[in-house]
Every structure is written in structure tokens, then in C-alpha cells.
């Protein structure tokens, strides 16, 4: 597996988004099977595993801890995220983003992972107005060896600049795909200027760009795609030209639509690392194999130019996701 740099953190070119093993995508695989899938990804060269304390309220971290227990810790990169407000069961009168609150979150996560440090610790869904204070706390945790690096999730340019001036940021994590490109305008270029990596979640638009989902497909009641408007049957039909474009390039490159969508994300900038979810052995092989699919400069320009002419119908919005009832009320992105 090829590797990429998130600032000084070297990770596999494609990581594994672990959320779906316990959260947001309907019935999860049995724990034993899920652990086997994580091990399969690791054996194929994936060393970057992303989770968060908010996913299933700590259960996803517990799963990742069990999955990496028998893997060599020095070859595993744990990417974890802490929520900016107290989650159920947390008593934090001093505030979640105080130093005491962040330390309490971190200590809980370390215990669930069964480790004494986290490689990349990210503020999940950025709160407003406290960037410099959080950055200062992150700097202390790095010096103490509790975390190796820190990041922000879905921040503004101003939030990045303020925090980065206090403690250098290693990575920004935000949604990025052929169907969600708003970060191209300012955040991704800024990352390049400041030597900050960019971790792209939902790089295949929650599976739409895989070409394996039909407009008539139904989902379990706890599946996030029930509330993501791009999966509305009318929007799926309206977005068919995007999928046809991706399939055209997949045919030319002798690969799958999902691999083309990941290859496009990778080509956008050398410091972008996509973290698709993958809960089947064949998806792991397919998605990780996308690291070997290379678009030439001309192919990338042509594909991007064609995408620019197509309208995207529907999106993934925090206000819609709250309707699912599986995330805290303060989700706004």
C-alpha cells in the first residue's frame, strides 16, 4: 500500500472509516467478523483507522480497541475524535472543552482503545470561538505524549488559522467527494499552504458513487441514508449523469466506479487521505485497490471539468442527520 503524509504522520494512502461497524449504516457485522475485516485491511496495507467517541456513544471506540488489540501498536495509526459537548453519561460541570473536560474524554478513549496514546486526536464538529484555547490544550497533550498529533473536523478557514498559529494542526477531517466539493475553494488549498493533511470522509458520497445502490433500495431504520437527501429516489435519478460519467471512466481504466471516485479524491491533492467505510471483504479489496488506480493530469482535468457541468441534487446535512435520532442535538454540520 502506498503511503501519504498528514504533516509528519505517515499513513496508508487509503484509510478505513470504522463508524459503520457499530453506527449509522443499519445492522452491523457481528463483532468477531468486524474484527476479522479490520485485520484483513491491515494485512493489505491499511494502517489508518478512524473512529470517534460519539459513534454509538463509545461503542465504536471499544470495537476499534478490540480490533487492534492483536495488531502491532507501532504499525497502527488511530484517528479518534472528541465531541465538543458532554455525551450521555458524562458529567462535566467545567465544560467539555475545558482542559479537564478534554483530558477526561481522552482518558476514557485511551482506556477503550487499550493504549497509552492516540496518534491523531480531532475536535469533532468544531465549536465556535474557542479555537486557540483548544489548540493550546492539544499542545500540552502532545508534549505529554498522550497524543501524537491533533486535528479539526469541518472547520472554517479562520478557525484553522487561529488554531494552527497556537499548535500546528496535522489534519483537517471533512466530507469530500465528487458530490461534495465545497472544501476545494479554500480549506484544501489552505491545507497545502500550511502543510496540513486533509482526511476525506464519505469519499464515495456514502456509497452512491459505488454504483451499487438503486433508487428503489430500502434501508434499516437506523441507517443514515434514510435522511441524506441525495438518496431520495428522485435525487438519485437526477444524479444519474454523475454516475454515468464515473462509470465511463471506470470502463476506460478497467476498474470499478468506486475506485474511480477514490482515485479522483487522491488526485486532487497529495495530502488528501480518503477513509471509506468498508464492511465486506470484497469492498476492502476494491477500495484499497483504488490506491493503485492513477488518473493522469489530463484525465483528472477532463473528469473534473465534466463534473463541473453537472448539478448535484441532495446532500448530507447535519440538520437532516439529527432526524435519525442517533447523534447529539447539537449537530449542525
Annotate each PLM feature.
Residues 89-182, 186, 197:
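Glycine/proline-rich, positively charged
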Residues 1-76, 330-333:
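N-terminal binding-site loop/beta-alpha segment at the start of enzyme catalytic domains
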Residues 183-221, 256:
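Aromatic-lined glycan-binding groove of carbohydrate-active enzymes
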Residues 1, 193, 221-248, 252, ...:
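Terminal-tail/helix-coil boundary detector
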Residues 16, 34, 49, 64, ...:
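Conserved, mostly hydrophobic/aromatic
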Residues 19-21, 54, 81-85, 123-126, ...:
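Active-site beta-loop-alpha junctions enriched in small/polar residues
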Residues 20-25, 85-92, 209, 283-286:
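A short acidic, helix-capping loop that chelates divalent metal ions and anchors anionic groups
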Amino acid at each position: 500500500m502506498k503511503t501519504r503524509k498528514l504533516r509528519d504522520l505517515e499513513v496508508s494512502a487509503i484509510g478505513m472509516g470504522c463508524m459503520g461497524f457499530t453506527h449509522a449504516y443499519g445492522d452491523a457485522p457481528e463483532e468477531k467478523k468486524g474484527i476479522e475485516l479490520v485485520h484483513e485491511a491491515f494485512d493489505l496495507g491499511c494502517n489508518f483507522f478512524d473512529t470517534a467517541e460519539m459513534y454509538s456513544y463509545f461503542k465504536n471506540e471499544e470495537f476499534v480497541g478490540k480490533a487492534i488489540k492483536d495488531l502491532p501498536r507501532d504499525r497502527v495509526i488511530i484517528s479518534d475524535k472528541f465531541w465538543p459537548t458532554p455525551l450521555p453519561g458524562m458529567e462535566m460541570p467545567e465544560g467539555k472543552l475545558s482542559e479537564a473536560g478534554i483530558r477526561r474524554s481522552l482518558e476514557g478513549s485511551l482506556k477503550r482503545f487499550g493504549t497509552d496514546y492516540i496518534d491523531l486526536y480531532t475536535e469533532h464538529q468544531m465549536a465556535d470561538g474557542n479555537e486557540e484555547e483548544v489548540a493550546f490544550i492539544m499542545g500540552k497533550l502532545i508534549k505529554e505524549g498522550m497524543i501524537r498529533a491533533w486535528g479539526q473536523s469541518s472547520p472554517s478557514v479562520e478557525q484553522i488559522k487561529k488554531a494552527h498559529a497556537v499548535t500546528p494542526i496535522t489534519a483537517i477531517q471533512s466530507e469530500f467527494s465528487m458530490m461534495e466539493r465545497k472544501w476545494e475553494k479554500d480549506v484544501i488549498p489552505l491545507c497545502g499552504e500550511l502543510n496540513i493533511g486533509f482526511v476525506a470522509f464519505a469519499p464515495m458520497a456514502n456509497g452512491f458513487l459505488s454504483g451499487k445502490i438503486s433508487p428503489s433500495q430500502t434501508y434499516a431504520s437506523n441507517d443514515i441514508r434514510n435522511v441524506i437527501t441525495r438518496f431520495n429516489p428522485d435525487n438519485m435519478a437526477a444524479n444519474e449523469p454523475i454516475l454515468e460519467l464515473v462509470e465511463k471512466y471506470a470502463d476506460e481504466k478497467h476498474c470499478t466506479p468506486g475506485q474511480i471516485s477514490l482515485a479522483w479524491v487522491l488526485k486532487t491533492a497529495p495530502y488528501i487521505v480518503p477513509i471509506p467505510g468498508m464492511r465486506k471483504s470484497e469492498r476492502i479489496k476494491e477500495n484499497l485497490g483504488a490506491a493503485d488506480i492513477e488518473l493522469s493530469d489530463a484525465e483528472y482535468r477532463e473528469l473534473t471539468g465534466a463534473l463541473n457541468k453537472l448539478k448535484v441534487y441532495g446532500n448530507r446535512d447535519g440538520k437532516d442527520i439529527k432526524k435519525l435520532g442517533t447523534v447529539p442535538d447539537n449537530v449542525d454540520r
